[in-house]
A protein has these predicted regions:
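Carbohydrate-recognition beta-sandwich/jelly-roll modules
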Residues: 1-244
């Protein structure tokens, strides 16, 4: 059973009576948690006055595995080209990522032998970012308003400058918080993916008929197909040749 125990300085997220995470309070703001389904809550933070900046932070216990869907899996750490590695840049600044980089908007996930925890944006159209980094207090899940990428941005094989967006001041900020007990396995993010699919899913009407889509698909593939004089054949799909 999950409970939220509030005090003046923080909200404790408790499982079977023991704290597994904590949510630091924000000055001049009130937090509320509305159950959506088992293990999932809509977290709403209302401020006394409109503001154009907010960080909604959940500090979980030390993690055995972390993930930012589509960006970082266990901290990455492979490859020879520029890549987001670990939870911080070389100068010690925690990475922050714009919502659109992640396959679930501004989503961060961590797990240990007691629980799995995820935090992400409630509205994909909100200007948000996320950060996931370890401190002595635990694993910090942060939903950031407005969108930003710090301390630098990863472009196509090179680093760019930091980015900080803007947003209209508001007095209401929303997030989705997921907490599930451990079943003893690892990489237990399937419930997160399943919920996100249901939560964000919506019907899409095909812009053209099935026959026309098939015709266009074949035409596009033929356009990309190339055969060289030495017999090599392949599809040009945006890949680049890098010498060396």
């Amino acid at each position: 059973m999950i409970e939220f125990l509030k005090s003046n300085t923080e909200t404790l997220v408790c499982m079977d009576g023991a704290a597994i995470a904590r949510i630091p309070a924000a000055a001049g703001a009130a937090d509320s948690f509305e159950a959506i389904e088992d293990g999932v809550w809509k977290w709403t933070r209302r401020t006394a006055a409109p503001t154009a900046h907010m960080r909604m932070t959940v500090i979980a216990a030390a993690a055995d595995f972390t993930m930012i869907p589509g960006i970082s899996y266990g901290g990455n750490g492979w490859g020879t080209t520029p890549e987001y590695v670990g939870d911080r840049a070389e100068d010690g600044t925690p990475w922050s990522f714009a919502s659109h980089r992640a396959t679930i908007p501004s989503c961060t996930y961590s797990e240990n032998d007691r629980a799995s925890l995820a935090l992400f944006a409630a509205d994909p159209d909100d200007s948000t970012a996320c950060s996931l980094y370890k401190t002595d207090d635990g694993e910090n899940h942060v939903l950031i308003f407005p969108e930003e990428e710090r301390p630098k941005t990863l472009q196509r094989h090179f680093w760019g400058d930091a980015f900080v967006g803007e947003m209209r001041p508001t007095d209401t900020f929303c997030a989705i918080l997921c907490v599930w007990p451990s079943d003893g396995t690892r990489h237990r993010y399937a419930p997160l993916c399943d919920f996100a699919w249901r939560f964000f899913g919506h019907p899409l009407a095909a812009p053209k008929s099935a026959r026309e889509l098939y015709r266009l698909s074949i035409a596009y593939c033929r356009y990309l197909f190339e055969r060289e004089r030495d017999g090599f054949a392949g599809f040009t799909m945006g890949a680049q040749w890098h010498l060396g």
